[in-house]
UniProtKB/Swiss-Prot annotation:
It is a peripheral membrane protein. This is Caveolin-2. The lineage of its organism: Eukaryota, Metazoa, Chordata, Craniata, Vertebrata. May act as a scaffolding protein within caveolar membranes. Interacts directly with G-protein alpha subunits and can functionally regulate their activity. Acts as an accessory protein in conjunction with CAV1 in targeting to lipid rafts and driving caveolae formation. The Ser-36 phosphorylated form has a role in modulating mitosis in endothelial cells. Positive regulator of cellular mitogenesis of the MAPK signaling pathway. Required for the insulin-stimulated nuclear translocation and activation of MAPK1 and STAT3, and the subsequent regulation of cell cycle progression. InterPro entries: Caveolin (IPR001612). Keywords: Cell membrane, Cytoplasm, Golgi apparatus, Membrane, Nucleus, Phosphoprotein. Phosphorylated on serine and tyrosine residues. CAV1 promotes phosphorylation on Ser-23 which then targets the complex to the plasma membrane, lipid rafts and caveolae. Phosphorylation on Ser-36 appears to modulate mitosis in endothelial cells. Phosphorylation on both Tyr-19 and Tyr-27 is required for insulin-induced 'Ser-727' phosphorylation of STAT3 and its activation. Phosphorylation on Tyr-19 is required for insulin-induced phosphorylation of MAPK1 and DNA binding of STAT3. Tyrosine phosphorylation is induced by both EGF and insulin (By. similarity). It comes from Loxodonta africana (African elephant). The modification Phosphoserine is found at residues 20, 23, 36. The gene is CAV2. GO terms for cellular component: acrosomal membrane; caveola; caveolar macromolecular signaling complex; focal adhesion; Golgi membrane; nucleus; perinuclear region of cytoplasm; plasma membrane raft.
């Protein structure tokens, strides 16, 4: 009735190391799935999504369900995750890829033809604006602040209790 004898029955659904009990997220090994085709996530953008059954459902040592219940629930978890993902990608992948393509094309066009020319124009104009601003600051704002400071420096307050 041990867990080791039941592992052979569910070998179809799970890997051998799926039974290891650990307390952290176990990211998938890229070499493990190397023979299954081209790498669809070469920059590991979604490595955080590779969660196993033990990362979602965990039983403490003091309370364990029956081995068959644990194995069946593990198998159903993996199968439902696989089937629902495939089902959703059939209906959502193409429209969302189309929408993402339109969004990124629009953002790229805006960045290339509007934002970058505006930024470059601002960077070209800023040295002259900086010179004018420094002159205005030195001629108007600095003397004004100095005179206001001198005026307030002669103010003194005396409090008396009556």
């Amino acid at each position: 009735m041990g867990l080791e004898t039941e592992k052979a029955d569910v070998q179809l659904f799970m890997d051998d190391d799926a039974y290891s009990r650990h307390s952290g997220v176990d990211y998938a090994d890229p070499e493990k799935f190397g023979g299954s085709g081209p790498d669809r996530d070469p920059h590991r953008l979604n490595s955080h999504l590779q969660l196993g059954f033990e990362d979602v459902v965990a039983e403490p040592v003091s309370t364990h369900s029956f081995d068959k219940v644990w194995i069946c629930s593990h198998a159903l978890f993996e199968i439902s995750k696989y089937v629902v993902y495939k089902f959703l990608t059939v209906f959502l992948a193409i429209p969302l890829a189309f929408a993402a393509g339109i969004l990124f094309a629009t953002l790229s066009c805006l960045h290339i033809w509007i934002i970058m020319p505006f930024v470059k124009t601002c960077l070209m104009v800023l040295p002259s604006v900086q010179t004018v601003w420094k002159t205005v600051t030195d001629v108007v704002i600095a003397p004004l602040c100095a005179s206001v400071g001198r005026s307030f420096s002669s103010v003194s307050l005396q409090l008396s209790h009556d």
